[in-house]
Design a protein with these regions (language model features):
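Alpha/beta enzyme core
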Residues: 1-88, 95-114
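Conserved active-site-proximal phosphate/metal-binding subdomains
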Residues: 60-88, 94-253
Length: 253
């Protein structure tokens, strides 16, 4: 299925219309429930709910509370192709248990980014895969110095420099003028483009090795099936408890 993904902001309606003319579906990543109506108003077909745990540009709402709200927001809505608007979950998902949790909350699918940074096939900068494997979930930060918008990246000495109270105030002044702090530092020879942030999600804490994409997919599916089997057992147990309780109540009557 041809798919165009808009990750920063709502795409112009004219762009969406042109894509539709060529049979291309449009997915919009959102970080707040109120963004859904704006996205649907321009004809977006799929909503990707990305929690703040995600790598790159993210909002402030975590994945767990965000997904159910987005699912509720699209309920009963149809896209330009006449099908219900699906919700794709994103943000901090790294294994089958996370996928199962998202499906339980009403998502139709998931969007994994950081999990595949460590794939052998990923086209990433030297050392990027190794950084993901070595880092823990607490080793990321959301910061605006690279694009002017909150962006979750790996913590470095450079990002640490910009998180002191004095530098935060300086950052806000630069952004108010439309100046990107990193570019200002590069211009003043206080940084180089090598200091640019490496986007990655808090999922890094659950990623322990570099492997082929095919193995990652196989692991995800095996974990998902195991999680769903656990759900089935739990549901069966609850149903038995309810049946026994109903029978006991009927006997007392």
């Amino acid at each position: 299925m041809p798919l165009f993904v808009c990750a920063v902001g709502i795409p112009p309606s004219g762009v969406v219309e042109r894509l539709h003319q060529h049979g291309i579906k449009v997915m919009n990543m959102v970080g707040r429930p109120r963004h859904v109506e704006k996205a649907l108003a321009v004809g977006v077909d799929i909503i990707c709910a990305q929690g703040s745990e995600g790598g790159g540009h993210t909002g402030e709402i975590a994945t767990l509370p965000l997904i159910p709200q987005i699912v509720d927001a699209v309920r009963g809505r149809l896209n330009a192709f006449g099908t219900p608007v699906p919700v794709v979950a994103a943000g901090g998902i790294f294994d089958g248990r996370g996928i199962a949790a998202c499906l339980r909350m009403g998502a139709s699918g998931v969007w994994l980014g950081t999990r595949f940074l460590v794939a052998n096939e990923s086209v990433v900068a030297k050392g990027y895969r190794e950084d993901v494997v070595a880092a823990k979930s607490e080793d990321t930060t959301r910061i605006e110095i690279f694009s002017g918008r909150p962006m979750r990246v790996l913590k470095t000495a450079y990002t640490d420099k910009w998180e002191t109270p004095e530098k935060v105030a300086e950052m806000q002044k630069l952004l108010a003028k439309g100046t990107i702090p990193l570019y200002e530092d590069v211009k003043n020879k206080e940084a180089t483009m090598a200091d640019h942030g490496r986007p990655m999600s808090q999922a890094i804490g659950g990623i322990s090795k570099i492997q082929p994409a095919s193995e990652i997919m196989a692991d995800l599916m095996a974990e998902l099936l195991a999680a769903m089997e656990t759900d089935h057992i739990a549901i069966k147990a609850v149903a038995e408890v309810q049946a026994n309780a109903t029978a006991a109540t009927a006997a007392r009557l």
